[in-house]
């Protein structure tokens, strides 16, 4: 059985105004990851991803490049204990 994990991910670079959140939701849904993604006031994008470890890791890896118009400079990942608090993956405002 695959271990369930939670990751708090902060993506730095040109990641706002390039549909990063929208594409993160699409990727998350494809990977059966739950949680949220949002823009931060400083220009970063942050997400909380929960699911099977391999699926969450795949979404984190995708965040290293993001959608085609994005320019990712850095991805910071904080691994946390799985809480199982989400049923969906969506954009937060």
Curated annotation (Swiss-Prot):
Its EC number is 3.6.1.7. InterPro entries: Acylphosphatase, Acylphosphatase-like_dom, Acylphosphatase-like_dom_sf, Acylphosphatase_CS. Keywords: Hydrolase. It catalyses: an acyl phosphate + H2O = a carboxylate + phosphate + H(+). Residues 6-93 form the Acylphosphatase-like domain. Transmembrane segments: none annotated. It holds the Pfam family Acylphosphatase. GO terms for molecular function: acylphosphatase activity. The keyword Glycoprotein does not apply. The active site is at 21, 39. It comes from the Bacteria. The keyword Hydrolase applies. Belongs to the acylphosphatase family. This is Acylphosphatase. It comes from Geobacter metallireducens (strain ATCC 53774 / DSM 7210 / GS-15). The gene is acyP.
């Amino acid at each position: 059985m695959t271990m369930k994990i939670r990751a708090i991910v902060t993506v730095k670079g040109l990641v706002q105004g390039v549909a990063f959140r929208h594409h993160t939701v699409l990727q998350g849904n494809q990977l059966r990851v739950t949680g949220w993604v949002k823009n931060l006031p400083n220009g970063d994008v942050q997400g909380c991803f929960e699911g099977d470890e391999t699926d969450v890791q795949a979404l984190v890896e995708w965040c290293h490049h993001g959608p085609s118009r994005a320019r990712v400079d850095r991805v910071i990942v904080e691994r946390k204990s799985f809480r199982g608090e989400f049923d969906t993956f969506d954009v937060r405002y």
